[in-house]
Design a protein with these regions (language model features):
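Conserved ABC ATPase signature
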Residues: 94, 135-139
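Conserved ABC ATPase "signature" region
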Residues: 102, 106, 111-131
Length: 250
């Protein structure tokens, strides 16, 4: 029986591609309203982990429960319970901001007054009022980011996945984005983030540091740094990268 405060639980989660084990025996729990960071060098298993949690690929062993849904037994149901946003945003650039939101609201099954009401809520929450009739393709990186988040939030998902969401976005927009993420977490949304920015990783309540498919360290930024032997999170990340490179050369 899963604790009602736990929104995501991974049990011996493993994924192999032939002889290569991308994720090995991952055991984690993530609480409701937690901002949780997945951190690690390229090839560490972050993306594979997220793909399993989103129901896009099946685990080779183990399982995970996401917002009450088993990723092995009901992968299609997971898509109704999660929001996903990547650095590419997934927008239709030849549609306006309003048209993009209306399209995604329809994809998620919102109709009539509930559809219009939810769009209005998200527009207000993210400050998109003055951009509604602008083509998505003409937006700056920061505004595309807001629109991508708006589309991901349209169906009120209890779990939100952010895959390097601020890549290529200016510092001011990044700061504003994280204020929004904190507000979402305060409302009870569980947010799982991958990022290469150490300052952003430090904003997460907890971090799972991965390397070559293994969970290396878990805790706050300071705790993770200490577990790896670094003076801070950035130093710990560099130490881990150097270890990986030495092992690959050996």
């Amino acid at each position: 029986m899963i604790d009602s405060a736990v929104t995501v639980e991974m049990r011996h989660l493993t994924r192999a591609f032939g002889s290569i084990v991308a994720v090995r025996d991952l055991n984690l729990t993530i609480a409701k309203g937690e901002v949780f960071g997945l951190l690690g060098p390229n090839g560490s298993g972050k993306t594979t982990t997220i793909r399993m949690l989103c129901g896009l690929i099946a685990p080779s062993e183990g399982t995970a429960i996401v917002a009450g849904v088993d990723v092995v037994k009901s992968p299609d149901l997971i898509k109704e319970r999660i929001g996903y946003m990547s650095q590419r945003f997934g927008l239709y650039e030849d549609l306006t901001v309003a048209e993009n939101m209306d399209f995604f609201a329809g994809i998620y099954g919102l109709e009539g007054p509930s559809r219009r009401g939810r769009i209005a809520e998200v527009v207000s929450f993210l400050g998109l009022n003055r951009r509604l009739y602008q083509l998505a393709g003409t937006l700056s990186g920061g505004w595309k980011q807001r629109l991508g988040l708006a589309c991901a939030l349209m169906h009120r998902p209890p779990v939100l996945f952010l895959d390097e969401p601020t890549a290529g976005v200016d510092p001011a927009a990044r700061k504003g984005f994280w204020i929004t993420i904190s507000a979402l977490a305060g409302q009870g949304t569980t947010v799982i983030v991958t990022t290469h920015y150490m300052d952003e990783a430090g904003r997460c309540g907890r971090i799972a540091l991965m390397s070559q498919g293994h969970l290396i360290a878990l805790g706050t930024a300071g705790e993770v740094a200490k577990q790896v032997g670094g003076k801070d999170l950035e130093d710990a990340f560099i130490i881990l990268q150097e270890r990986d490179e030495q092992e690959q050369e050996a």
